[in-house]
């Protein structure tokens, strides 16, 4: 059988785009904690010595945005000019307006309610925008994620951990990982290449210090004993291939909310509708429906209805009911895909208000989603990672 290579990347919490995501979600959480019905769309731009926050907010809450910005940056580890950024002394500008009344009327008073087609409370909330959202799951890992992105995230988290714990004390917060996996058909069989790029202090030897430390303290703990049938012997290791990575963080590159949407999802292994997540409250289906589609796809795979599942949903702004649902199982289904799709429509309510209710999305839980992936981490607050509907799906699909 033909063998092919697939690659996914991850970034650490200190990557400039991820700093921006964490600031935006930190502001969102602060507002939701005081007013769960807050409407929030906050974008962050971070560059050398400066942070700019802009967007639209309608809320009864108050958030000290400059304080949130500084606390987020300091918590990540940018606390000195030697690291290229200092959260205590950077400039912060804020430009926040209110949500458009034209959008609000469609969200608060959905098409179905306005036209008299329904009086259901769940039909009262329309989608906050048009668009299509995808979810994906596969049986490659215990968390039902593709192997390349799952391993890339593990390495990024470990890279940050050894920096924070002082195991590799000369590391700085900015970093990236990339993993290439060899596939035989649809099955991952071999780790081919691992790339790690990490910001570091000055005068650190790449060959005699950084590369051995990355191999021993970052990669080895994650790949040794990984199991899952993956051959992890003799993979190629690349560490800081430019030869030096002293200038990093916002000094090296400007960061912007929503610029790591593939890192946030499935590492390019599945399709993406294009909408970013961070800084958006759950009335925005870009976020809430993408979470719901992960929930759907994961339950399809957990139910044994398919080994791989991609689910797409689409909405019209101001309408509660989706305009379409599409389920793809790539020939791995155990029952006809039409039955799976029908079971999904019976078991899951994909109206925005129902998604928010079922996944408990009005809680201030979003800061923890903003780095290391929104999917595949089975944390208590990540309700979309639950497989609580698998038995119902299996029963309705007649499996």
UniProtKB/Swiss-Prot annotation:
Binds 2 divalent ions per subunit. Binds 1 potassium ion per subunit. K(+) binds at residue 43. Keywords: ATP-binding, Cytoplasm, Magnesium, Metal-binding, Nucleotide-binding, One-carbon metabolism, Potassium, Transferase. It comes from the Bacteria. Residues 99-109 are annotated as: Flexible loop. It catalyses: L-methionine + ATP + H2O = S-adenosyl-L-methionine + phosphate + diphosphate. Its EC number is 2.5.1.6. GO terms for molecular function: ATP binding; magnesium ion binding; methionine adenosyltransferase activity. Its main location: cytoplasm. This is S-adenosylmethionine synthase. Catalyzes the formation of S-adenosylmethionine (AdoMet) from methionine and ATP. The overall synthetic reaction is composed of two sequential steps, AdoMet formation and the subsequent tripolyphosphate hydrolysis which occurs prior to release of AdoMet from the enzyme. The gene is metK. L-methionine binds at residues 56, 99, 253, 284. GO terms for cellular component: cytoplasm.
């Amino acid at each position: 059988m033909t063998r092919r290579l697939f690659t996914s990347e991850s970034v650490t919490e200190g990557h400039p785009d991820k700093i921006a995501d964490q600031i935006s979600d930190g502001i969102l959480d602060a507002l939701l904690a005081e007013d769960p019905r807050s409407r929030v769309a906050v974008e962050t731009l971070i560059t050398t010595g400066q942070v700019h926050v802009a967007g639209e907010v309608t809320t009864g809450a108050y958030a000290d945005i400059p304080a949130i910005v500084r606390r987020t940056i300091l918590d990540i580890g940018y606390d000195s000019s030697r690291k290229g950024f200092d959260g205590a002394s950077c400039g912060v500008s804020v430009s926040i307006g209110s949500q458009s009344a034209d959008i609000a009327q469609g969200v608060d008073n959905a098409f179905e309610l306005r036209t008299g087609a329904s009086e259901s409370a769940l039909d009262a909330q329309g989608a906050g925008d048009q668009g299509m959202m995808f979810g994906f799951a596969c049986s490659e890992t215990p968390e039902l994620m593709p192997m390349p992105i799952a391993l890339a995230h593990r390495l990024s988290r470990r890279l940050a951990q050894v920096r924070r714990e002082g195991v590799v004390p000369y590391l700085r917060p900015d970093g990236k990982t990339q993993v290439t996996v060899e596939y035989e058909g649809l099955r991952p069989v071999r780790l081919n290449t691992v790339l790690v790029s990490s910001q570091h202090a000055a005068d650190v030897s790449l060959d005699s210090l950084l590369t051995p430390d990355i191999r021993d303290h970052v990669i080895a703990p994650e790949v040794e004993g990984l199991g899952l049938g993956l051959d992890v012997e003799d993979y190629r290791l690349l560490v800081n291939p430019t030869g030096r990575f002293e200038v990093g963080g916002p000094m090296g590159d400007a960061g912007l909310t929503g610029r790591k949407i593939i890192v946030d999802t499935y590492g390019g292994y599945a399709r993406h509708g294009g909408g970013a997540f961070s800084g958006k409250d759950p009335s925005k289906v870009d976020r809430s429906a993408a979470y719901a589609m992960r929930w759907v796809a994961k339950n399809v795979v957990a139910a044994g209805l398919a080994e791989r599942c991609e689910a797409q949903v689409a909405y019209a702004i101001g309408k509660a009911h989706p305009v379409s649902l599409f389920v793809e199982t790539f020939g791995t289904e155990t029952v006809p895909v039409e039955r799976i799709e029908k079971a999904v429509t019976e078991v899951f309510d994909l109206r925005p208000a129902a998604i928010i209710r079922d996944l408990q999305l009005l809680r201030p839980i979003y800061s923890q989603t903003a780095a290391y992936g929104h999917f595949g981490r089975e944390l208590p607050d990540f309700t979309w990672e639950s497989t609580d509907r698998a038995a119902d799906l299996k029963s309705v699909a007649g499996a």
